[in-house]
């Protein structure tokens, strides 16, 4: 009690067909902190000790909350197969999107940040985006993406916004 910890926010059963096959992301018994159980913004949170990691003193209270979203971003970038020089669009410049942008930059990609908020796009530029596109007008945004990629489209598009229309945009914009 009182220790500073990072939390693995997903609980799985470990015994169902999917868990036994290594496909824990589709476990029907899954609980996710903040959705199916109390999350980190609750005054108190009960969570299994084996899903927590003690934070060392050299990780500040400001940095600690970025551990979980950073793992999401880095995992996605690793799975993407990105290569140095690839054109990458990151749709959504919230916490996960900005961390994803930085991970793609670290991998040597040219990154186009896409969002509906100009303030978020300014922050994306400060954090390393090579180009920014406001997608309030989807047709204009699609044309800008094509222009920025030589009429081919991004090699990879990461959808981090979670909006209804953004998965379709990601599929349509990405090169064939």
Residue ranges with predicted function:
Residues 6-10:
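Glycine-rich phosphate/pyrophosphate-binding beta-alpha loops
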Residues 90-93, 105-169:
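Adenosine-nucleotide cofactor-binding segment
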Residues 97-98:
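N-terminal Rossmann-fold NAD(P) dinucleotide-binding loop
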Residues 174-176:
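Helix-to-beta-strand junctions that scaffold the AdoMet/dcAdoMet cofactor pocket
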Residues 11-91, 121, 135:
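NAD(P)H dinucleotide-binding glycine-rich loop of Rossmann-like/cofactor-binding domains
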Residues 2-4, 85:
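Loop/turn positions that initiate beta-strands
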């Amino acid at each position: 009690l009182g220790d500073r910890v990072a939390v693995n926010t997903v609980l799985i059963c470990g015994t169902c067909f999917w868990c036994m096959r290594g496909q824990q992301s589709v476990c029907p018994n899954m609980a996710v902190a903040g959705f199916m159980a109390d999350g980190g913004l609750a005054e108190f949170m009960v969570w299994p000790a084996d899903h927590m990691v003690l934070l060392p003193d050299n990780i500040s209270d400001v940095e600690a909350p970025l551990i979980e979203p950073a793992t999401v971003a880095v995992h996605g970038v690793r799975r993407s197969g990105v290569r140095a020089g690839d054109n990458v669009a990151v749709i959504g410049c919230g916490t996960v999107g900005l961390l994803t942008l930085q991970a793609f930059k670290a991998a040597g990609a040219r990154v186009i940040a896409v969002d509906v908020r100009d303030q978020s796009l300014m922050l994306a530029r400060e954090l390393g985006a090579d180009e920014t596109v406001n997608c309030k007008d989807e047709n204009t945004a699609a044309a800008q993406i094509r222009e920025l990629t030589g009429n081919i489209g991004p090699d990879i598009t990461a959808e981090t916004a979670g909006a209804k229309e953004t998965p379709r945009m990601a599929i349509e914009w990405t090169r064939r």
